[in-house]
């Protein structure tokens, strides 16, 4: 068994090595990659493998159905910024290293998008019906998918103290920078 980034076990590829091309799966992968919002999504498409577990396949299909329906019914789904910041995160693990400004800005926007998307999905099933009661869960699979996702709002707040909404370093990012910029004015 092979494990993807989503930590779900999937079977190894079917022999022969060109099986996907022979049955047209490679063209489906290309179509999926065209719709990905980030390079990380494209990587996940590359990692997809055949699955023969009916329950898992049905779960994935329900997630897709719900998300397609959600995109058709709601124009306000927060899907604005998804950046693959893994290289920067790997680099800053070393002591005395830090994000470059652009990396921090991408990291902040990605975290914010994830935070808003998870809150949006969680809020879907808390909406009230016409009688003022909590509406029936119409997006159960998406709700389950979002359940337990950590969104790190404190990191978003800390990044906001350093960069503004345009990705520029704030004068108040540090006392030293604030002093230098005041002296330059």
Model-identified regions with their sequence ranges:
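Conserved amphipathic alpha-helical "coupling/scaffold" segments
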Residues: 2-169, 173
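Extended, Lys/Arg-enriched charged tracts that mediate electrostatic binding to polyanionic substrates
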Residues: 177-185
